[in-house]
Amino acid sequence: MPEITGIAHVELSVRDLDTSVAWYTELLGARDVWRGSNGKYGITACAIYEPKSKMVFAFTQHAEQETSGFSPRRPGLDHVSFGVADHAALEEWVNHLDALGIPHSPIQDDHQPPSVTFSDPDGIALELSYPKR
């Protein structure tokens, strides 16, 4: 069987490209690495890169958009979870989210894995978690 070496990137459809790119860039300390558009498909897109984790996140804004909003109950994406090292890292992230004014859950130690949940500007469910060992 051919080998998969990892997830190359995660791409989200967003209502406002500039708003989402600014929000995720500030949240993750990432940098904008690519922008482009394709008139044939009616899209504008951007990719950001977070060097510590080597994570690439991409965003697409469609000229024609569905406006019903995100729901984890609709088949498709449930949430995106960012991995952190340990409980102390979750506490640091809670402080970072607070400093950015991003509403979030308390640390949920009763979950497996322990986590903090919040949403992006489009209501996409996000999580910070670490595996209990």
Give residue spans per PLM region.
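Core segments of cupin and vicinal oxygen chelate
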Residues: P2, E11-V56, Q61
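Vicinal oxygen chelate
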Residues: P2-E3, I7-R15, C46, P51, S68-R133, ...
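Acetyl-CoA-dependent GNAT
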Residues: T60-E66, Y130-K132
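A short, local hydrophobic-aromatic micro-motif
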Residues: T5-A8, V33, D78, S105
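A short, acidic/glycine-rich surface segment
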Residues: W34, I43, E64-G69, H104
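Short Gly/Pro-enriched turn/cap motifs at secondary-structure boundaries
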Residues: S37-N38, S71-P72, P106-I107
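Alpha-helical elements of the RecA-like P-loop NTPase motor core of helicases
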Residues: V21-A22, E91, L126
